[in-house]
């Protein structure tokens, strides 16, 4: 997922045919209470806003900050530029928050970090601010708010932009081989991919039916989640307020076996799936005309339809397939904004959060950076819809996206899942053994945090 963040600005300079992103730091008294809503002239002070991303994203954030400072002449927002690497961004924030530093005051977080940040007490609850300002939360994706931003009945963050896994397909090849629509089930995908792969290899021996992320890293967990939940499985469940892992459920083992079969039995996915396939190798293979189907994030749409893309105008996008009797599942991704518990100017930080989440700024992210806004109402904006031909379909995917476990030990849990799922893909151990071992280690991990 790191590459995804780096390219997010280029992202949908087509995924919906558009482009995106933001920044802010310190000032008054540390308190969780909310004072009266400041006016444009009364608001004073400085805050630090930490954000990473591609160069064009950082430049856009500078523009957002300039507009905020123009609205509030007595305010200064310092942009603290983070690395493009997602994990490095997390570690930088963790170090600052563990040290109870007021720098940064406000920052973006990958949705997968929320469990750790909330459980560690690093985020300022936003409920009092929302209530005081009568702030309308209904404009956001409610599933995202409830599954990711709220915990224990309290609100800790707001979505800036949304991501979810998608199926890309070659419209021209489906038509060439007699298919009128993309696959709805995984078995349909296998059958279609095999037929297209067989035919295309007569002239292109490097052609593959289906490419996806199988290397040992975070996006492998995202892919695994999609197979698991589209088969009625789950990674875990909450019982009596405690998360209980369910990694070796029969549905999960069946899903992992299918992933293995894509490479070794059906042979529609390349052998290097589990050694090299991350977002960019997957995207490039599809974009160079060497694959019929691709699992990737929304950012790939714009790149597939760039002027120099060999597949420009030939690509369709659809929800990911599912197993019989179940529904499509897409892993929830994206970035959320929150306020540090240790900020010296929480009131100013909250005003900045509201500004970033305002209709005009969110629309700007969509129009200029190609981001998928956290606000639902922006998806109905005529200008955004005009620039985003697939926005309506993507919106439905986002509304039903599945989050990874929102638990404080998610980074360690992810490493466990990555390790054993990848070992199964490589043929080192069976899917059953892989998930049995993952289950045992996950149970031990949970005990450490009990």
Curated annotation (Swiss-Prot):
GO terms for biological process: maltodextrin transmembrane transport; maltose transport. Keywords: Cell membrane, Glycoprotein, Lipoprotein, Membrane, Signal, Sugar transport, Transport. Residues 1-24 form the signal peptide. Glycosylated. Its main location: membrane. The protein assumes different conformations with different physical properties depending whether maltose or trehalose is bound to the protein. The complex is composed of two ATP-binding proteins (MalK), two transmembrane proteins (MalG and MalF) and a solute-binding protein (MalE). This is Trehalose/maltose-binding protein MalE. It comes from Thermococcus litoralis (strain ATCC 51850 / DSM 5473 / JCM 8560 / NS-C). The gene is malE.
């Amino acid at each position: 997922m790191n590459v995804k963040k780096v390219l997010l600005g280029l992202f949908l300079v087509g995924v919906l045919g558009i482009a995106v992103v933001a920044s802010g730091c310190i000032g008054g008294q540390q308190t969780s209470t909310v004072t009266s809503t400041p006016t444009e002239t009364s608001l004073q002070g400085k805050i630090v806003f930490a954000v990473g991303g591609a160069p064009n994203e950082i430049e856009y954030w500078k523009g957002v900050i300039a507009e905020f400072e123009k609205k509030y002449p007595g305010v200064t927002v310092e942009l603290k530029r983070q690395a493009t690497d997602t994990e490095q961004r997390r570690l930088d924030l963790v170090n600052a928050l563990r040290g109870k530093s007021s720098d940064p005051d406000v920052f973006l977080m990958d949705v997968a970090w929320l469990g750790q940040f909330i459980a560690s007490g690093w985020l300022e609850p936003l409920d009092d601010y929302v209530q005081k300002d009568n702030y309308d939360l209904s404009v956001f994706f409610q599933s995202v708010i409830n599954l990711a931003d709220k915990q224990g009945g309290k609100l800790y963050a707001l979505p800036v932009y949304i991501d979810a896994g998608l199926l890309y397909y070659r419209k021209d090849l489906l038509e060439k081989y007699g298919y009128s629509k993309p696959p709805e089930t995984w078995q349909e995908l296998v059958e279609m991919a095999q037929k297209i792969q067989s035919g295309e290899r007569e002239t292109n021996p490097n052609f593959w039916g289906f490419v996806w992320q199988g290397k040992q890293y975070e996006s492998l967990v995202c892919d695994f989640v999609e197979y698991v939940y589209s088969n009625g499985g789950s990674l875990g469940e909450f019982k009596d307020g405690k998360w209980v892992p369910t990694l070796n459920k029969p549905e999960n083992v069946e899903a992992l076996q299918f992933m293995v079969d894509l490479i070794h039995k059906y042979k529609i996915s390349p052998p290097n799936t589990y050694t090299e396939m991350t977002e960019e190798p997957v995207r490039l293979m599809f974009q160079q005309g060497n694959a019929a189907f691709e699992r990737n994030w929304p950012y790939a749409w714009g790149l597939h339809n760039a002027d120099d893309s060999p597949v420009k105008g030939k690509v369709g996008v659809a929800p990911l397939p599912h197993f019989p009797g179940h529904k499509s599942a897409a892993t929830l991704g994206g970035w959320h904004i929150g306020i540090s518990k240790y900020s010296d100017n929480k009131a100013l930080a909250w005003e900045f959060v509201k500004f970033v989440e305002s209709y005009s700024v969110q629309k700007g992210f969509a129009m200029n950076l190609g981001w998928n806004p956290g606000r639902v109402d922006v998806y109905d904006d005529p200008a955004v819809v005009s620039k985003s031909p697939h926005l309506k379909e993507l919106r439905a995917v986002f509304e039903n996206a599945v989050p990874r476990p929102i638990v404080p030990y998610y980074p360690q849990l992810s490493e466990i899942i990555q390790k054993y799922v990848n070992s199964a893909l490589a043929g080192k151990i069976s899917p059953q053994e892989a998930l049995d071992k993952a289950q045992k280690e996950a149970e031990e991990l949970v005990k450490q945090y009990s």
